[in-house]
Structure formats: structure tokens, C-alpha cells
Amino acid sequence: MLERAKRLAEHAHQGQRDKGGHPYILHPMRVMQHCETEEEKIVAVLHDVIEDTEVTLEELKKEGFSEEIRNTLVCLTHREGEGYMEYIERICQNPLAVRVKYADLQDNMDLSRIPNPTEKDYARLEKYQKAKVRIEEAMKG
């Protein structure tokens, strides 16, 4: 299933670029490397497909991804009009989402991938730091 997730993510993110101008698929692949279980790795690779691509939950179901994986991907999808910390609190209710979001934040907080960080990048880093503290609390139980 992990190989299927990688192929699906590569296809879905094709042509997308990150804030540093690099192919976007590198981000979910790096997040995956910070995860331990196969389930975490699958969610990591797919964590932005619902929010940032045309992939639907129905397609993921047809591809054979479990209900738990699909529910976790829904949990990791930032809803329109939802405050960022509200989104983080929602993630804190799902242990699998918590573990993947922690890895996601670690990668998002690495400003070395952005050639010339701006004030906006540093403000985003501060927001991510607050989220990371809350996610770490959730990880401790």
C-alpha cells in the first residue's frame, strides 16, 4: 500500500512547487521519512492530496486505502474558514494524525529549503512552533 500511496501522491502533486520552488512531492516524501509505521508513512505521503489536489476520498477508497487512513487524511485537511489552532486541536483528537502532523511540522519548520526567507516565512515559523508545542502535548497523552 505504501508504494501505491507514493505513486498516487507523485501523480497528484505533479507540477506543484513548494515555497522554495522545489517539486512539491519532496515535502510529503520527507515527512514520510520521519514516520515509523507503514500506516504513518502512507498517511504522510498522502497528507496533502485531499487539501491540495483533485484526489477525492472516494478515489482513495477505490484504491484500497483503509477507513482509518481516509479518516486521518480528512482530519489532516485544513478546512476553509477554520482557524489554524482550531485545526491543530482537531488533529489532537486522532493519534495517527498527531504523529504525522508532528513530522509535517518538523519539515515545514526547516527554513533552509527557502532561499531567502521573508518576514512572512518567519511569522509562519512562529505559528508552526506554537502548533508543535500543542502536538507534543498530545503525543505525551
Question: How does the language model describe each region?
Answer:
Residues 1-141:
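Active-site helical microenvironments for divalent-metal-assisted chemistry
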